[in-house]
Amino acid sequence: MTIEFSNFSFRYESLDKPTLKNINLRIEKGEKIVIIGPSGSGKSTLGQCLNGLIPHAIKGETSGTLTIYGQDTAPFDMHQYTEQVGTVLQDTDSQFVGLSIGEDIAFALENQLTSNIDMYPLVKATAKMVDLEQMLDRSPHDLSGGQKQRVSLAGILVDDVDILLFDEPLAALDPKTGKKTIEIIDDLHRETGKTIVIIEHRLEDVLHRSVDRIILMESGEIIADTTPDEILASPLLEDYGIREPLYISALKEAGCAIEGDAKPSSLTTLPLEQYKPTVQAWFDGSTAQPPKTPAETLLEVRGLTYSYDGEKNALEDVSFDIKRGEFVSVLGKNGSGKSTITKLIMGVIEADSGSMSMNGQDLNELTIFERSQKVGVVMQNPNHMISHHMIFDEVAFGLRNRGIKEKQIEAKVLEVLELCGLSKYRHWPIEALSYGQKKRVTIASILVLEPELLILDEPTAGQDYRNYTSMLSFIEKLNRELGVTVMIISHDMHLVLEYTTRSIVIADSKLVADAPMTQVFSSPELLDQANLTTTSLFDLATKVGIEDTNGFMQHFINVEKAHRQQKSGEVNQPEKAVA
């Protein structure tokens, strides 16, 4: 046995009620487990208890016991925790300590006073394990998201700990890089026999490689401790607002019964011949029509080129239009230039060449403040946007800057907080929120300004399925009923599939596609070029012999959209807060 929580509870110093309640969990040596649950369910808190951040960096009250290799951790100092558990954080930038990759990997060895003669081969061997041996002199801050993950992983592997804890390792990664990360974790697990604990929202992506168990948490309690096959065959994921794999959703929509003994945790192990007639009949009965594209142009981009360093172009001769009332996505791998487009539209940086106009007006003629009256941008990292201590004040900030009367501000802020599932937290300090809740605060602070063009940069990062569905269904309603134009910058294929109608694809700084979303998602070669992957919906259609993959995906989207609109009057239960 490696890890055991026995009747373990924890209450943050700043909260009245415990965040973890009577946890009983046993993890055997060499197991690979995944912990899932809604935002604020206690997943990350459990991880912080395991790696010693609680109680050493984060104060609170504990009861019960946590043992690692049979030793009670209560008397452990931080050094004793780090000898046993290595952690790769969701925000890898906050984990770097060295000026170069080599220095960062060597940090733990330097703390142990390892000689340079012994240190160099250890650093090089560890870097090779994660395919970084040719990059030891580069700065970790200059790397892509996937490369940063590998640097963080190398930094803990060099210390040869027995337990590896990954806190949402896929949150900021494009699909192909995410797959590679899961493969690296799985290879390490098989080759070293280390105990692996993964905390993650993206269950389908984690199940790219097999895991032993899935732990489902809600409200600080363990709801289920079972196998991947059993949880996918049960209603638990839907009941607790966890996003199930796309192929499972499609099979259920088609009327297929999913049983645990059918091994549903992988599309390759499912008895698809058994489901084939049912799926084909479901599709044959469809009348899927692609959505109509509005005619009026809101944003026109022509020949946009920009370089950060004057040498390599971050964007090169990019042209596209955004129609008024559209819901579009900009796709591409980490570092492809997607976020550069946002910065140029905002006016934070100026294009080297090319033009942008909105409602026929050249954006270069507008100040950043004037642009902000027309364009609202929700950044990927909520901590980069938040400037106030209290939630209400943060959401009201933009309206107060516009000189609106306080009575009107209060009414508008309360309306948006209610729509975003944050009304009950309006008098809370922002630091008492989870990462996902902070994300919703930033979205609320932009929505309250009623922009003509709303840009969401990776809106699902740190969000669970229930809450991002609630949020994006609300934005979808604004788009449908009020004509708000929405542009999502993302590499979350599931999100793009569910909500957007057209995809602008950027690869290596160039525009490689501007087409209906289902057409893009039916082009494996194009997706591969952009470091994206086909969805399991496309793979399912192919495996059951449906040639019109475009139509199959559109039918599924239409059915899902109809379900969302039926539920649009329902209020989703807001996530629980954590400090």
UniProtKB/Swiss-Prot annotation:
Topology in membrane: Peripheral membrane protein
Domain ABC transporter: from-to ranges: 3-244, 299-533
Primary localization: membrane
Keyword Chloroplast (UniProt): no
Residues binding ATP 1: 37-44
Keywords: ATP-binding, Cell inner membrane, Cell membrane, Membrane, Nucleotide-binding, Repeat, Translocase, Transport
InterPro entries: AAA+_ATPase (IPR003593), ABC_Co_transporter (IPR022216), ABC_transporter-like_ATP-bd (IPR003439), ABC_transporter-like_CS (IPR017871), ABC_transpr_CbiO/EcfA_su (IPR015856), ECF_ABC_transporter_ATP-bd (IPR050095), P-loop_NTPase (IPR027417)
Presence of keyword Membrane: yes
Matching PROSITE patterns: ABC_TRANSPORTER_1, ABC_TRANSPORTER_2
Known role: Probably part of an ABC transporter complex. Responsible for energy coupling to the transport system.
Family as reported in the entry's similarity comment: Belongs to the ABC transporter superfamily.
Protein's UniProt name: Putative ABC transporter ATP-binding protein VPA1482
Organism: Vibrio parahaemolyticus serotype O3:K6 (strain RIMD 2210633)
